[in-house]
Structures are given as structure tokens and as C-alpha cells.
Swiss-Prot record:
Reactions this protein catalyses: thiamine triphosphate + H2O = thiamine diphosphate + phosphate + H(+)
Record-given protein name: Thiamine-triphosphatase
Subunit composition and interactions: Monomer.
Keyword Ribonucleoprotein (UniProt): no
Organism classification: Eukaryota, Metazoa, Chordata, Craniata, Vertebrata
Localization of this protein: Cytoplasm
Length: 219
């Protein structure tokens, strides 16, 4: 699999004072934006059940989230993000046991791979960034996204992007530290927008994922 950045993240339920608290901590509001996300999978959810998440974001193109290191525990997740279409196509074919086509982007292989639209919704996002210093004095940029989906669900996410697995523990330390400063419960975990969408509007698909992940929320 072509290597991409490793995304380490933790989702949480934002409160009415979350943005104010981010300002107090020295955070900077980068932008407010509205976009549509569309997720694709097979009718059996072969990708999601294997912890792969294929998304097309309006204005940003395709992204495939691939599972990170095994054994990562706690109220956070770790994924490798692929955004180059040839890498995405190659990984999709590997997961689904298909031959890699000679040419064509993601859209061209949706039909041959049996991938169809599973969910589509609009999100309003406030994107923040801030720098935290760790116990070792090293500074790390963290991003905080505060999202409200068009079906009425609000969720926040603290995220760090790293280049190699060895950097993950330090990123987790910063994420946990910022989460505590924001008043997030230590073991609290908010479900992703997609999971809530499936639970509300495609309950049979939601049950398929529960069979695999139990009470653990993905992605």
C-alpha cells in the first residue's frame, strides 16, 4: 500500500463554550466551511466491515482511510489516509480481491468493484488550529474541527497528522492533554457523523457494523 500520512484523532461532543475555550488556549480559527461528504461501499459493506472508509468530499476529491496499527486502545483512532487516486484504486482492489485496472480513477472503478453510494450529507465546519508543548518541550500542531451535520448531529474532533508510527505516542499525549483542557471526559467517545447517519437512516447497515465492532464506534 502506498504510504500516506497517519491520522491520529479523537472525537468528542462539543459544548456551547468549546470555541471560547479554544480561543483562551491560543487557538486560531482558520475558516468556516460547508461541504458535502459522500461515502461508498459494497451492498455488504465490505470496506467498512474491514475498517476501510471511502469518501468523496465536495471540492476536495477522494480519500480512503485505512486502519492503523493493531492494538491501539482508548477513546481515539488511528488511520492512514490515502488521497492519490492510483493508491486508492490499488488499495480498494486489494481489499476487495479484484485485479487492478490498467487506467482510470476512483469513479471509473466504482461500478466494476460493486461500490455504491451508502451515505451523503452536508456538514458545517469550524476549523481551528493551535500548538501545544509536551513534557519534552516539543511543540506539535493540533487541529480541532467542530462539525454540525445537516441531520442535526454535532461532533468535535482533535487531530494530529504524523509521518511515521514512532510519532504516534507523542501525538496521542498532546491529543489527550488538549482534550482534558477542553473538558472532554477521559474515556468519553463521540460517534462519527457517518455512524450516526447510518444508525438513523440505514439501521440495517448500522447493525452490520455493530456485528463487527460491537459498541466501538468507527471510524
Amino acid at each position: 500500500m502506498a504510504q500516506g500520512l497517519i491520522e491520529v484523532e479523537r472525537k468528542f461532543v462539543p459544548g456551547p463554550s468549546t470555541e471560547e475555550r479554544l480561543q483562551e488556549l491560543g487557538g486560531t480559527l482558520e475558516h468556516r466551511v460547508t461541504f458535502r461528504d459522500s461515502y461508498y461501499d459494497t451492498p455488504e459493506l465490505s470496506l467498512m466491515r474491514a475498517d476501510y472508509w471511502l469518501r468523496q468530499r465536495e471540492g476536495s476529491g477522494w480519500e480512503l482511510k485505512c486502519p492503523g496499527a493493531a492494538g491501539v486502545s482508548g477513546p481515539h483512532t488511528e488511520y492512514t489516509e490515502l488521497t492519490a487516486e492510483p493508491s486508492i484504486v490499488a488499495q480498494l482492489c486489494e481489499v476487495l480481491g479484484a485485479e487492478v485496472p490498467g487506467a482510470g480513477g476512483v469513479a471509473a472503478v466504482l461500478g466494476p468493484l460493486g461500490l455504491q453510494l451508502v451515505a451523503s450529507f452536508v456538514t458545517k465546519r469550524s476549523a481551528w488550529k493551535l500548538v501545544l508543548s509536551g513534557a519534552d518541550g516539543e511543540e506539535r500542531l493540533l487541529r480541532v474541527d467542530l462539525d454540525t451535520a445537516d441531520f442535526g448531529y454535532a461532533v468535535g474532533e482533535v487531530e494530529a497528522l504524523v509521518h511515521k508510527e514512532a510519532e504516534v505516542p507523542a501525538a496521542l499525549e498532546k491529543i489527550h492533554h488538549l482534550s482534558s483542557l477542553l473538558g472532554v471526559l477521559e474515556q468519553g467517545r463521540a460517534p462519527a457523523k457517518l455512524i450516526v447517519y447510518l444508525q438513523r437512516f440505514r439501521p440495517q447497515d448500522y447493525q452490520r457494523l455493530l456485528e463487527v465492532y460491537g459498541s466501538k464506534e468507527k471510524p
